[in-house]
Each structure stands twice: as structure tokens, then as C-alpha cells.
Amino acid sequence: MNKSYVYFMANKNNTTIYIGVTSNLVKRVYEHKTKKFKGFTAKYNCNKLVYYEEFTDINQAIAREKQLKAGNRKRKEALINAVNLDWKDLSEGWLFYFDN
């Protein structure tokens, strides 16, 4: 059974939040941090993992991502604050190593 994740990336000042979905959270966070893709997170320097949820079904994760993206910022902040009041980078200390 493969795990899937919905996650929030924030910039240094916590003024911008990006919501994404992935089946490999460690790799995806690494891609955001290294700006592998020149998209939203690279443009707005969203390189802190501040929140994530785990799912056993990718379809549930995608549905949750859509639900969260449709919500207002206050609701997103409440989710983050419930588990990460200081908005610390939850990936701090992770070792990033990939064979490609």
C-alpha cells in the first residue's frame, strides 16, 4: 500500500503558502528546496515544510488537496498552528539522498 501526502510549503516570512500532493514527500520537499522546477514555490521561495497529512489512497489525497486549496487562509493557518505553532520547517534534519 503506497502512501500519499498533502503538504504545505511556506516562505521565510510565512506570507505565502503553497499546497501540493505527492506520493514521495521527502523527494518532493527536496525538489522545492532546491528549486528543481521554476514554478510557484521557486518564485515565492516556499521552501519550508510547515504541514502535511498522510493518506493510503492517492485519490483521497487529491480530494483533500482540492478541499484545502478552496479554503481561506485563516483555515490553512489554523491547520498549521494546531500542529506547528511556530511554523518550523518540519523537514529540518531530514537526509536527502536519491538514486534518481
Predicted regions and their residues:
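Short, surface-exposed polybasic/aromatic micro-patch for ligand or macromolecular engagement
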Residues: F55
